Amino acid sequence: MAAPTKCQLRGRLVLLCSLLGMLWEARASQIRYSVPEETEKGYIVGNISKDLALEPRELAERRVRIVSRGRTQLFSLNPRSGTLVTAGRIDREELCAQSPRCLVNFKVLVEDRVKLYGIEIEVTDINDSAPKFQAESLEVKINEIAVPGARYPLPEAIDPDVGVNSLQSYQLSPNHHFSLNVQTGDNGAINPELVLERALDREEATAHHLVLTASDGGEPRRSSTVRIHVTVLDTNDNAPVFAQRIYRVKVLENVPPGTWLLTATASDLDEGINGKVAYKFWKINEKQSLLFQLNENTGEISTAKSLDYEECSFYEMEIQAEDGGGLKGWTKVLISVEDVNDNRPEVTITSLFSPVREDAPQGTVILLFNAHDRDSGKNGQVVCSIQENLSFTLENSEEDYYRLLTAQILDREKASEYNITVTATDRGTPPLSTEIHITLQVTDINDNPPAFSQASYSVYLPENNARGTSIFSVIAYDPDSNENSRVIYSLAEDTIQGSPLSTYVSINSDTGVLYALCSFDYEQFRDLQMQVTASDSGSPPLSSNVSLRLFVLDQNDNAPEILYPALPTDGSTGVELAPRSAEPGYLVTKVVAVDRDSGQNAWLSYRLFKASEPGLFSVGLHTGEVRTARALLDRDALKQSLVVAVQDHGQPPLSATVTLTVAIADSIPDILADLGSLQIPADLEASDLTLYLVVAVAVVSCVFLTFVITLLALRLRHWHSSHLLRATSDGLAGVPTSHFVGVDGVRAFLQTYSQEFSLTADSRKSHLIFPQPNYADTLISQQSCEKNEPLCVSVDSKFPIEDTPLVPQAPPNTDWRFSQAQRPGTSGSQNGDDTGTWPNNQFDTEMLQAMILASASEAADGSSTLGGGAGTMGLSARYGPQFTLQHVPDYRQNVYIPGSNATLTNAAGKRDGKAPAGGNGNKKKSGKKEKK
């Protein structure tokens, strides 16, 4: 054989070291003590705390305790001293019977370590029992012809002690015919025999009396005696003889009582009474005599009670056969009890660690239990198992002890409770099993933050809500339990329009209901962005955030506002001019209105609510343009009153009305003449303050008119047409009208002074408005126009209009009239489209409203640029490219600036040095300038 290699030697050495280590560990975990029997309760066996390397106080802290397997607890732990003491009186003979060594084994569990330590205690014997015979007297019959040397068995004494304290010797009282011989059996038992030394003579003595003494070797020595009565019989030649020297039989432990086991037969060659044999148990202990019965006539042995293999698996006894003549024979009977699988496994729970934290690491001990089967062989082999698909595993720790361990990290949110069934099954046929059911609770840890059902929330709230209104409820779910799942809601700190978010909304910390702390106005702001935080009450607390956007929905809470015509503060209405020669579709004026709402709440519709002459005028549904519906007739009244209603499309719709007064005349003098003939109620009285104001304005107007007339006279003295000058002067003497005088030149400036008489039929007052001078070059700079801030002064006239003579007027100059191209509208020469489509979205509508408001502001301030082209009122340059009539109702051109009858010329035409295409009057003036 080849020599082993170095690798093989190294491997064997490692294996040897491992085995030695395991043996050392096993030995180290086994603690041995000894204690004498019959000690009192509380006898100190050993210092177990020292042997476990623990302090006495740690026995309670670490929950150290004794675990045993169904046996009465013989020992206990003293937690104060850390010692192992007896729990009561210990009787070695009762505990271990005749075993040479009486060992008591149990386990000590250190629960916090989940570790078992083996404890072995040897109970030492003391000489507390004396040898004892089963009977106090014994009769022995011997035939007188017995040959010296014959031997007669004597009963044995029983001593439950062991060792030197057990039976050691027999002594026979002195006698000339008998002696004592002691035989030692295979099992070490001492068997006394009576030996005949001299022949007996019945005629000499019919009986002999002997005393047999049994003694042990203990200190003090104990003994007992039995009296032997020997009867000398007449001649009996043959003694009973058994067919077998030793009888052996096997029996199952589960046989019922009365089951026949065997028949021990002895034969006697004598006849008559000397040949009749009687049977009885000779050497049998008290327990065996209760389990078996013997027929004294037949020698049949049967069971008297049920046998139990686990209690005793082997029985040995002797049977005596005696004939009528007193001769005896003996035989030995050996009964083996065979095990059957009649015991189910026994499961004893040693420790149960419930509840267990869900974050317990893998391999955490949940259960420690003992599984034992009292049967033997395969019937006593136990296999334990648990149901499948659980997060646990079983491990056989040592001997019959098993540990239930966690196989993975537990999750309370998936399973908060486990119902575990442990099944212990033996290997017998058929197999028997035992089940135990345990309920394991899993305690929660705060390992889950609250979770919202959505990544973000969009909430819609109508404006003008009541304070304290419930807006929305956010819900966050925390799968943890108890305090770890109690969610607290809060809002992240933020600032909106300079104010803390907490002044606008609040949230209920328990329910997550969001409340409005103020009444929201869509026109102030339209949405709020906030962050909701959900925190649990665990330790440490976990939280999560969600974005919530609150949209304020517009409500129809604003009625349309009419920008033009603007109502004077005294409640009167303005007068619009319509020539009698106007054709159907003639643009008289335009009503401009806006709505501060949005969406369809701001979509406006115009309609003619009331008219003094039905059918004469029409109003554009979307544009607000007031046009003639038919040609004017002579029978039509001079003054026409129209009530135009503007209504939005909200629910419910809101509306506003404006009253328009339309004067039908071809020129301003005609208007004044016609209006002068109107009767004004005389019961209207003006205040003194109004009178003073009118007088002051009249004086200033006269001075200003004088200055203007003088200036014009000096400038126009070279004009060839004195008739035109006289006509103009006569016209100014009667009615102050607006003058627009332009001087051609590269750097010439034009100062325009405008006057406007606003005469109403409902008032005796006339309003004379003086705007500030407007300096502009021929290009009419938009910048300079935007700087104009009109100063309006009202002059009230106390005199009745009908009493004032009007100077006859010359034919109106075409320069003073509005051409069709210069009328307010989308186009100077085309009728408005009343069927335009509405904007398709809120953004377009809001942009359109912004443009209308901007245009209206410029109109109110008098700063609107007039050079943007005819019919656009200066809006085309800024807003023209975005929206046209073909797309949306033309709110951009709803800005109409009254009070001026100047010709709206094209700025581009002026820059080119070309006169605008006006009336004939312009052409004549231009020709005269060239001549000059």
UniProtKB/Swiss-Prot annotation:
Glycan-bearing residues: N47, N127, N389, N419, N545
Composition bias type Basic residues, residue spans: 922-932
Topology Extracellular: residue spans: 29-692
Predominant location category: membrane
Source organism superkingdom: Eukaryota
Entry keyword set: Calcium, Cell adhesion, Cell membrane, Glycoprotein, Membrane, Repeat, Signal, Transmembrane, Transmembrane helix
Domain Cadherin: residue ranges: 29-133, 134-242, 243-347, 348-452, 453-562, 570-683
Disulphide connectivity of cysteines: none
An annotated GO BP: homophilic cell adhesion via plasma membrane adhesion molecules
PROSITE patterns: CADHERIN_1 (PS00232), CADHERIN_2 (PS50268)
Signal peptide as annotated in the record: 1-28
Region (Disordered): 803-841, 902-932
Record-level Gene Ontology MF annotations: calcium ion binding; RNA binding
InterPro entries for this protein: Cadherin-like_dom, Cadherin-like_sf, Cadherin_C, Cadherin_CBD, Cadherin_CS, Cadherin_N, Protocadherin/Cadherin-CA
Localization (cell): Cell membrane
Cytoplasmic side: 714-932
Cellular component GO terms held in the UniProt record: plasma membrane
Transmembrane segments: 693-713
Bias type Polar residues, positions: 816-841
Membrane topology classification: Single-pass type I membrane protein
Function recorded in the entry: Potential calcium-dependent cell-adhesion protein. May be involved in the establishment and maintenance of specific neuronal connections in the brain.
Protein's recorded name: Protocadherin gamma-A9
Taxonomic path: Eukaryota, Metazoa, Chordata, Craniata, Vertebrata
